[in-house]
Amino acid sequence: MKKIAALLLAVLMLTGCSADSSKTSEPLTPDKVFSGGTPDIDIEGYQRPSSMLSMSAQQIVMNMRIGWNLGYSLESCFSNVIGDYIPDVTPNDWQTIDETFWGNPAVSEKLFWRLTDSGINAVRLPITWREHIDESGNIDEDWLNRVQQVVDYAYNCGMYVIITVYHDGANDNDAWIRNAVKDYRSTLSIYTNLWSQIADKFRTYNERLLFESMNEVEFVGSGGDRGYEILNGFNQAFVDTVRSNGGNNGYRHLVIAGYAADITKTCDPRFKMPEDIDNHCILSVHYYTPKTFCRASIQNYWGNKSEQEWMEHQINNLRTTFIDNGIPVIITEYGAKGSDEASRVFFCEMLTKLCRDNYISTFLWDDGSEFDRTSFTWHPPELINALKRATSGNSYVPEKPENIDEQTREAKPTSETSEPDNEPAESEPTEEHTTTEETADIPPETFQSLTG
């Protein structure tokens, strides 16, 4: 029986998931999104691989009604980046780096039950591994067990859960994934070893557990084409490593990191989705535009005509580049920091409604300021109600706060930014990259699948 299952998987993998975002296909329609219905979910834990195989990635995405990020918790780490919303601290004892290191309380099961009660049914767990692995990528057992415990908190509430690799790929000096620019092979070895252990730990979990390859990684200094080649190679290695682990990982739905999580850069034809079995890969990008409103309280109001039009333009870009070509999309992070509460709520509702209408799920970034993890209350209270409206399926236009046009400048946002912890570099040159000694290790390789 195992040989038959392996043979089936090998045949499916040869067909490819969606290797190129530029391929054409018939535009998506609602009946295609939901064709086949929604399979029953086994909240007790294990689900047969055949059930996971029958449920498409787009169905998974649409089942995620309201998503939420457990920010500033499991991704806590030492950082020497000044500002940019990463606490700049130097611990006296490296062992003190745990989920409370950036000021939030230890994660409890009660937190996820309260989130569920409020309407959240999907959670993304940003996890930084670099403080808990050795030089080969072997994970500290206690840390991996704690990660599993937190996963179980959410999973046992019936939530969808996304596990990701977080500040291991950020732009500070300890973000080891960026070393792939100089040492591709060794960095890839650490990366695949890390994911092999994570995959093995969670191999029996059903379709409500998803893995995300990495968070907002761009390879600064790699030079245009080379940066895309490196990311594409790592994403392919991620897929192949998980698939080769066996168990439910042969069919697990996987979330693929876009280039720097930036919509414009990811819609670039140089970005490629990895080869995989059909309908089991999902694209991940972020939306933090404009940065003066989303990342800092420099701009306190949002919602004039040009700002709304830019949001619509970017979501349409995702729709035509990926969704209409059979590639599901999740905006795994979005949020706002402007001081005007009405503007923040309007921004979140507008984005969520627009995405939902285009078959995209969204995950609110929360560093502890949106949902208080002690009192278990939303700030402002209207935020969660707005998200419920936006994901209700009802046809309506979110109501813009009064006087927004007078409070905001009628100017097109100049650039797209990343999640609130790191600002990505400017778009790299489009001209062909000339290889140097620093970047000429080896070309990214596509691993041969071991599953068949």
Spans of model-derived segments:
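C-terminal motif of bacterial Sec signal peptides marking the signal peptidase cleavage site
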Residues: T15-G16
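Sec-dependent signal peptide recognition
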Residues: K2-A10
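Intrinsically disordered, low-complexity repeat and linker tracts
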Residues: M1, D20-Y46, P401-G452
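Active-site region of glycoside hydrolase catalytic domains
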Residues: D42-E44, R185-Q299, Q314-K337, D357-I360
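Substrate-binding cleft of secreted/luminal carbohydrate-active enzymes
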Residues: M311-A386
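N-terminal carbohydrate-binding accessory modules
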Residues: E26-A122
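An active-site-proximal structural segment forming one wall of the substrate-binding cleft
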Residues: F101-A122, I133, G137-H167, A175-L210, ...
